[in-house]
């Protein structure tokens, strides 16, 4: 019957396989989005609660030591504040899309979600990169600017920041994968007949 219509049976099978692959890509998106939500939420919470105090002796008056307490908080560095905000926005956005995904099934709405996914990916990547540069500065210092490293005194602060950074970069990688899945699922149906 296909030969009467001018189609080859292999073309119809290829079109069916393409639709099956697209269906698998569409069903995989909520799983990846949930993983992005978890990774970015963990990063935002860990960095948002990151605080450590360090007490040291600054002078000795007679026989009595004078101490001073230094505190490292994420709020002290604008890059870490941006990191927390970017991860919070990304986790909130992904949660919102997960909750409303049944409503967003039409192609036009799916394309707007794809465009917003790219914006969130950019926001998340820049937040992670700025925090990583400040974390590197805190760990190694900058000898040319005479900025000493602080991770030898604030070890817990640096460890928690590192965990938050790893979680955020996992979120960036998953968000990139989600963008690729979304682009493949939203691509127009290919012309199998070659016309």
UniProtKB/Swiss-Prot annotation:
Homodimer and heterodimers. Residues 47-78, 136-160 are extracellular. This is CASP-like protein 1B2. The chain crosses the membrane at residues 26-46, 79-99, 115-135, 161-181. PANTHER family: CASP-LIKE PROTEIN 1U1. Residues 1-25, 100-114, 182-195 are cytoplasmic. It is a multi-pass membrane protein.
